[in-house]
């Protein structure tokens, strides 16, 4: 018998790659266990109790990933398990995509670590948000599109399937369409003469169809809300589908009437925030970019006519082993989300996470640049990881003496468990003015009969009669009135009811939840929250 061939030796960089993936996953698991639930997460986890093809704010992807809450309804870790699985799968798909792009094992290792260590990667890998299913579908769509651009045009169908799944996670997945078109025109324009890209679009539409049908049945509720939210426009939700209590308030952009200078500053602010998502890694990245340019043009006396800046930048970011399809997809996937939301930022406020998917393609595109300073990039990545780890620890303990502006995580998470225990014993119907208070108290007290009183603040899924029964003021009056939980001292007038009394609760960092009384000193000097419990009773009959 011929001698058995020894198995091929595994590149040490490949071992480091899979070790990095394992360590990243373990860190995310620990952070998900340590970090208390945040307000929007509690809202999404509540959706999982009533799965549907759509919700007031988003399509159903985030609710589906939250079904771990069925195992332990008051556990943040259980509620995040689906998110953790999807986030880990996203990194695995990205490894396959980066390998297909032509990156070496060393580059794959560096790019994986940097991608996961951006602030976007660290946060989205832990928190249960719609961005997680969106990122997974985006990565899958990029992988399939690359194969299609290289000649197997049938893969536009699978890219379309991934796009449809992404649309079921978050409507921002629609931006992949222009990215694909840009890449096709650059790398394979003849594909537009074949049926495959169009079959891919049809596949996306078919997968997305259940949510479209849900929107049709609910007067385009979620799409109208998101369009108004994204572009600061008044979309109006028809009373036919949702009732008058669901009519959305008029939206006016703070940039309305602004001059060119203010709009330009808004765009620059948006781009600055996107750069800040790199955290400490932005500094070695700039050094690597400078070294790339300096190596390209070491002679400072060279005429600009022979070394245009655009050519030097193109060489700096694309001198790796990227073929035309890979380069087209990476450039389009990076520039289109940034350019699109930069344009939106000139007219309407843009949240930092809306364009965050540009990082999935920007990082491998900049692999040659980062390769000039790999140790510095890894050290900066560890710095980001340490910074977020300390912040997660602070969210759990509140031990760090941070200024008020840096205490947002405590405002998001602290005291709600005690609040839920307090309001669970109140007699009579209970409502809150904001959906966040409803979600947090229902998370910590599963089954708590609390709803959102309509017309006071932004409407939510709680007013649709799915998660909670629709509010019937007549039935509430027959019950003798209700309690209203609010974080505002303002007492809204509610037709048919008057105020009988109120209680004030202080959420103190060290002392916990304490009730305040007019004739006694305040329970603490700087509470994280003040919550009012206002008792409304029916107006006396005429």
Residue ranges of each PLM-predicted region?
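Membrane-proximal, lumen/periplasm-facing interface regions of secretory-pathway glyco-
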Residues: 351-352, 376-426, 435-451, 455-465, ...
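Membrane-interface transmembrane helices that cradle and orient dolichyl/undecaprenyl
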Residues: 9, 99-105, 141-156, 319
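Transmembrane-lumen/periplasm boundary regions of multi-pass, lipid-linked membrane glycan transferases
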Residues: 176-297, 322-325, 337-339
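Short helix- or helix-capping micro-motifs
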Residues: 21, 108-119, 143, 163, ...
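Hydrophobic/aromatic-rich transmembrane helices and adjacent perimembrane loops
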Residues: 51, 280, 335-338, 347-375
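Transmembrane alpha-helix segments characteristic
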Residues: 19-25, 163, 285-286, 294-302, ...
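Short acidic/glycine- and proline-prone juxtamembrane loop motifs at membrane-interface regions
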Residues: 120-134
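Transmembrane-helix motifs of polytopic, lipid-linked glycan transferases
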Residues: 18, 81-103, 117, 140, ...
């Amino acid at each position: 018998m011929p001698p058995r061939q020894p198995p091929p030796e595994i590149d040490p960089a490949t071992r480091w790659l899979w070790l990095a993936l394992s360590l990243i996953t373990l860190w995310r698991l620990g952070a998900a266990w340590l970090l208390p639930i945040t307000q929007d997460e509690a809202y999404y986890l509540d959706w999982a109790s009533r799965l549907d093809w759509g919700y007031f704010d988003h399509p159903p992807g985030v609710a589906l990933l939250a079904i771990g809450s069925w195992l332990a309804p008051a556990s943040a870790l259980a509620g995040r398990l689906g998110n953790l699985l999807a986030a880990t799968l996203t990194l695995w798909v990205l490894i396959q995509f980066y390998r297909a792009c032509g990156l070496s094992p060393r580059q794959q290792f560096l790019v994986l670590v940097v991608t996961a260590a951006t602030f976007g990667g660290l946060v989205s890998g832990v928190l249960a948000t719609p961005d997680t299913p969106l990122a997974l579908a985006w990565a899958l769509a990029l992988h399939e599109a690359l194969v299609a651009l290289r000649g197997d045009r049938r893969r536009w169908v699978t890219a379309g399937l991934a796009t449809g799944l992404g649309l079921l996670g978050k409507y921002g997945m629609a931006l992949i369409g222009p990215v694909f078109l840009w890449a096709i025109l650059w790398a394979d324009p003849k594909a537009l003469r074949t049926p495959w890209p169009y079959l891919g679009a049809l596949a996306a539409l078919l997968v997305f169809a259940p949510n479209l049908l849900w929107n049709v049945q609910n007067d385009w509720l979620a799409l109208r809300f998101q369009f108004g939210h994204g572009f600061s426009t008044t979309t109006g939700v028809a009373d036919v589908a949702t009732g008058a209590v669901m009519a959305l308030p008029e939206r006016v952009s703070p940039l309305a009437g602004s001059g060119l200078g203010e709009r330009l500053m808004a765009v620059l602010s948006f781009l600055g925030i996107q750069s800040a998502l790199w955290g400490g890694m932005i500094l070695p990245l700039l050094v690597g970019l400078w070294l790339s340019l300096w190596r390209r043009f070491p002679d400072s006396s060279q005429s600009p006519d022979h070394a245009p800046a655009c050519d030097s930048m193109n060489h700096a970011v694309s001198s790796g082993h990227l073929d035309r399809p890979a380069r087209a997809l990476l450039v389009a996937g990076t520039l289109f989300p940034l350019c699109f939301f930069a344009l939106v930022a000139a007219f309407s406020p843009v949240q930092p996470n809306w364009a965050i998917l540009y990082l999935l393609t920007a990082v491998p595109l900049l692999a040659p640049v980062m390769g000039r300073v790999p140790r510095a990039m890894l050290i900066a990545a560890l710095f980001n990881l340490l910074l977020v780890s300390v912040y997660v620890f602070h969210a759990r303990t509140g031990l760090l003496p941070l200024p008020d502006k840096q205490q947002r995580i405590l405002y998001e998470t602290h005291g709600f468990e005690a609040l839920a225990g307090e309001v669970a014993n109140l007699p009579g119907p209970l409502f809150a003015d904001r959906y966040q208070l409803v979600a947090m108290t229902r998370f910590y007290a599963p089954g708590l009969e609390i709803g959102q009183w309509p017309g006071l603040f932004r409407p939510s899924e709680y007013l649709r009669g799915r998660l909670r029964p629709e509010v019937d003021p007549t039935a509430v009056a027959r019950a003798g009135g209700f309690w209203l939980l609010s974080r505002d001292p303002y007492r809204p007038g509610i037709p048919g009811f008057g105020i009988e009394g109120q209680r004030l609760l202080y959420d103190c960092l060290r002392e916990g939840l304490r009730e305040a009384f007019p004739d006694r000193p305040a329970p603490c000097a700087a509470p994280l929250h003040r919550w009012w419990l206002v008792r409304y009773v029916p107006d006396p009959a005429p």
